[in-house]
């Protein structure tokens, strides 16, 4: 089995960026997804330009910050995106507004000069029932993989792909992670593990309720213990280039 450790939130804060780079250079992270239009975006781009082996995708924003378009249907009274707590309860989103905003973020990302590796989203917003089909079509248009939604799986990738958010919060630990991967090994060819490594900074503490835990993630993702365990169990670390958004491709 192969495993993709994808680090979310690239571009959120400098501490997040530095943690992701540390997890890439000294650990098992080979892929990340960047949030455009966020405070540490320029810093993230500068770092990415010096890391050719780090595959960078787009971390679509629909629950954080302000939109790039004038999609009034997507925001609250303050002009920011609908807060996370309210986002999932709404069922009145305009699919055209969703499409326009997502495309704007993709095009913004490409204009930064980065190669688009794949697409996912902050708080898994693209799995909202009104967002899912729209974002799926956009991923197909740009011919890049989309983090598992139920619409994209073996039929698209040509292999048994599985996404897991197990490595998060109270479940962050070496033993827990390895045991979880072993339960998946016989059933899947490629498993994506969501992760959030970071070096804690004041900006992160101010904008995220998930802050201190990120340093524990970083410690595990860069540990010799994890690298040895993966080799012991014949689990190969890979990146999102393993998944090609086209039928009949074998990623085994």
UniProtKB/Swiss-Prot annotation:
GO terms for biological process: polysaccharide catabolic process. It is an enzyme of class 3 (hydrolase). Its EC number is 3.5.1.-. It comes from the Bacteria. Mg(2+) binds at residues 59, 122. InterPro entries: COD_ChbG_bac, Glyco_hydro/deAcase_b/a-brl, YdjC-like. Belongs to the YdjC deacetylase family. Probably catalyzes the deacetylation of acetylated carbohydrates an important step in the degradation of oligosaccharides. This is Carbohydrate deacetylase. It comes from Vibrio vulnificus (strain YJ016).
């Amino acid at each position: 089995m192969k495993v993709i450790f994808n680090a979310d939130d690239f571009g959120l804060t400098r501490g997040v960026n530095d943690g992701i780079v540390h997890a890439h250079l000294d650990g098992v992270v080979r892929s990340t997804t960047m949030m455009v239009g966020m405070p540490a975006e320029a810093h993230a781009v500068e770092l990415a330009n010096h890391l050719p082996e780090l595959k960078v995708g787009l971390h679509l924003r629909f629950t954080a910050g302000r939109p790039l378009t004038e999609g009034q249907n997507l925001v609250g009274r303050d002009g920011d995106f609908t807060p996370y707590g309210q986002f999932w309860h709404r069922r009145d989103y305009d699919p055209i507004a969703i499409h326009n905003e997502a495309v704007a973020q993709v095009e913004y990302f490409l204009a930064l000069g980065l190669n688009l590796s794949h697409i996912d989203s902050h708080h898994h917003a693209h799995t909202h029932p009104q967002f899912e089909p729209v974002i799926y079509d956009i991923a197909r248009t740009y011919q890049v993989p989309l983090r598992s939604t139920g619409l994209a799986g073996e039929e698209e990738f040509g292999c048994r792909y599985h996404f897991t958010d197990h490595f998060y919060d109270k479940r962050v630990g070496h033993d827990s992670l390895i045991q979880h991967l072993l339960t998946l090994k016989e059933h899947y060819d490629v498993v994506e593990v969501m992760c959030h490594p970071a070096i804690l900074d004041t900006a992160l503490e101010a904008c995220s309720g998930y802050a201190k835990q990120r340093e524990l993630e970083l410690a595990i993702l860069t540990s010799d213990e994890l690298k040895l365990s993966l080799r012991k169990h014949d689990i190969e670390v890979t990146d999102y280039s393993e998944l090609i958004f086209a039928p009949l491709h074998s990623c085994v």
